[in-house]
């Protein structure tokens, strides 16, 4: 069995290649990058306590972009150092997935750290490409949405974030269903037939909108609310009423001034904005590559479903369940490592037979 680790800036996700161990742990590196030590140490202890026998560890990351690091290069190297420090006592091989889709040892990172930056989406795409030759992979997560075209089994997406963010690429949408500032999606909202500009303050996030709409539960709200410091308990901070109050504040007012109906309307407009953004990306992919089938992953699958339906495209049923969907890059890198080791062993056996 193999372990996959996806180190993000906000969440660290883990999964075993058989899917028996799956978790997403909120670990905001920008608060203190040492938090990654604590998270991975708990993972290590959990593996020991449960007696799970790990043959190897595969790692992908996006956390290097966190502004607790001066540069992304520094971030990649620091994340590697932390992972290596924690797992060196397990006596298993730890390898890192690079932009070419190749597993390499930690020492190789010294040569070109950026070759290992933001590779989590690529692991997911590579695994899917082994099962589907012509498809668009959409992974809508807490912070971003990856839109990855696969044509004839070849991953057509650009390899760097800046290239995928290009206005003509539509491959990286920097919005997700939990952590995105509502002001980044809506510059104006409509209420009671009138149009209002929104405040650019961090008053509300997409998690608030989807909690109000019922698309996520309090348990799904795995990040801090914008005003978490104002509440005695997390339960209070992440109640539906608190979420509506934060949405109302986007218009510099209290909930009493716009009512629940007004807050609900803002939430609907947040969802419409995200769905429409994805519709634009999917339409571009369909026209550019003649693709009409979509595989969805991530906690924001409800956004993907609405966009696919609006375009009358076909949403395929993935081979993984909802638990694995939420941590797909971690599962993918574990599965890819398992496949690679199995192929290597088969090759060695074949050579011995000869």
Question: What positions do the PLM features span?
Answer:
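Conserved Rossmann-like nucleotide-cofactor binding loop
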Residues: 10, 143
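Nucleotide/phosphate-binding catalytic cleft detector across ATP-hydrolyzing
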Residues: 1-9, 15, 21-138, 148-354
